[in-house]
Structure formats: C-alpha cells, structure tokens
C-alpha cells in the first residue's frame, strides 16, 4: 500500500523520514486500482494538510482527536497543519480545522516503521453529521482473508506526483501478521509485532494515502504505513495494527 520505491527516497528525506531497508512510507498519493467514492461512505476519513496541501490521510477517533501515521508528522510544525473533514474532495468543501498539537508514538522508528501511529488534537471540535463521524478502534485483529477497505487521496501509481481531488477506495483482504512475514511474501523479518497487512490483485494504497484508514467489520483495524511500491505482486500493503496499538491511542487521545 503506501509504498515508495528507492527512487523516491528524496521525497521521504524531504518529509523528514528515513527509509527502512529500501522500503519507503507513502507520503503523497492515490489509491491504486480503486474507485471514486463519496465521504458519506467513509465519513471518518480526513485529509491531513500541510500549508493547505494534502499530505496524508487520517481517521476521526473523537470530535477532537484524529488517528494517523507517525511518519506523516516528522519534522513538521503544528502551525502548518490543518485537517479537512466532511468532504469527498481534499481541496474543497466540508470543514477545515487547525491542529493544536500532535503526539507520535514514543516507540516509532523511521528505520523499521514499527509503532507507526500518532494522534492529532484539533483546535476546535468537529460537529458530527452524515459526512463527519468517528470510527471505533479494533480490539483484536481480523482473521487472515477478512474483507477490508482502504481509502484516501493518494497517488494512483507508484512514483506518481499527481493526486486525485476526489476520495478513492479499494476493497482488499487482510493478510495476517504471521502470513505477511512468511516466505509466501517478500518482507520476512521486516514485518513486526505492531503491523498488519492487506492485499488484493492490482489494488493498494499508495503515496499520499499514508495515515489513512484500513477498515474491516466497521472498525479501524489499520493505519496506512508502508510497503514495497504500490500494488506490487508479492508485497502486500503494510499497516500499523490498531488492535496492537489501541491502548496507546486511548491513553494519549
């Protein structure tokens, strides 16, 4: 899912992250193999913006707290950040709210991408509606093969510079942590305890979808984190596992 190839290392460096073993986090992009959708189908989705431009995705946890990826918030000032909620378009509609503070997981590592989760506190509360809703955190990981969806405004191909204005989504299937780390796929020991994977042929999240929601069974099960390319065969998208990091989110929200 959110994946850069090595040629995009300059982008990651510009955004303040280091790259784990040639596998890059996605910082600006589109859903690969996806379909345009509306925010009413994914009302917990927000666009995290730096200086008014889409940077990453995120999920509404409470009316004042957003869950996103820690790698989205490296070397960035709070004053440059805002979120847009309640719109199918990252650049218009809905509401924009300034960020008052954020906290990255203390155990986050840009080298290994372990604990890639963060919470954002908003300067004012969101008003919930049909297009702005919170989503519950998973308390356990879904089984291997479970149906899931991922949404965002990320690039639609690996290495692309352009992003769509309208929200995109793809349906994927969960790949359990143990299976994702097995010889079936190409990651091996790069898959850690706080990660979960998802895949579908020709479909994935990509640059710019980072921090966005992986949803299964109506709850947030993953946060778009990293991967090898976008929709590359043998390399599922890798997500921060919300069930494994739930206690940290609740404690810091």
From Swiss-Prot:
Record-annotated disulphide pairs: 56-72, 180-197, 206-230
Pfam families cross-referenced by the UniProt entry: Trypsin
Signal peptide: 1-22
Enzyme class per UniProt: hydrolase
Domain Peptidase S1: 31-253
Catalysed reactions, semicolon-separated: Preferential cleavage: Arg-|-Xaa, Lys-|-Xaa
EC number: 3.4.21.4
Prosegment residue ranges: 23-30
PROSITE patterns: TRYPSIN_DOM (PS50240), TRYPSIN_HIS (PS00134), TRYPSIN_SER (PS00135)
GO MF: serine-type endopeptidase activity
Any single GO BP term: proteolysis
SMART domains documented for this protein: Tryp_SPc
Compartment list: Secreted, Extracellular space
Site, Required for specificity: residue positions: 204
Keywords of this entry: Disulfide bond, Hydrolase, Protease, Secreted, Serine protease, Signal, Zymogen
A Gene Ontology term for the protein's cellular component: extracellular region
UniProt-listed InterPro entries: Peptidase_S1, Peptidase_S1_PA, Peptidase_S1_PA_chymotrypsin, Peptidase_S1A, Trypsin_dom, TRYPSIN_HIS, TRYPSIN_SER
Active site: 71, 116, 210
Family, as annotated: Belongs to the peptidase S1 family.
Name of this chain's protein: Trypsin delta
């Amino acid at each position: 899912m959110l994946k850069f190839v090595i040629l995009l290392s300059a982008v990651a460096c510009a955004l303040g992250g280091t790259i784990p073993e040639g596998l890059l986090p996605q910082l600006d992009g589109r859903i690969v193999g996806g379909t345009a959708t509306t925010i009413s189908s994914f009302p917990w989705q927000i666009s995290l913006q730096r200086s008014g431009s889409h940077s990453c995705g995120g999920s509404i946890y409470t009316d004042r707290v957003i869950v996103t990826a820690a790698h989205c918030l490296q070397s960035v000032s709070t004053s440059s950040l805002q979120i847009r909620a309640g719109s199918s378009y990252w650049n218009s509609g809905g509401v924009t709210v300034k960020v008052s503070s954020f906290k990255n997981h203390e155990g986050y590592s840009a080298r290994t991408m372990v604990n890639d989760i963060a919470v954002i506190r908003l300067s004012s509360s969101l008003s919930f509606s049909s297009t702005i809703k919170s989503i519950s955190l998973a308390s356990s990981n879904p089984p291997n093969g479970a149906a899931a969806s991922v949404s965002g405004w990320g690039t639609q191909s690996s290495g692309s510079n352009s992003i769509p204005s309208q929200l995109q989504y793809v349906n994927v299937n969960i790949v359990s942590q143990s299976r994702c780390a097995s010889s079936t796929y190409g990651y091996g020991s790069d898959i850690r305890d706080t990660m979960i994977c998802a895949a579908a042929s020709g479909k994935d999240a990509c640059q710019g979808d980072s921090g966005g929601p992986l949803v299964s069974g109506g709850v947030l099960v993953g946060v778009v984190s990293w991967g090898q390319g976008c929709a590359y065969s043998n390399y599922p998208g890798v997500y921060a596992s919300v069930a494994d990091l739930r206690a940290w989110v609740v404690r810091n929200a």
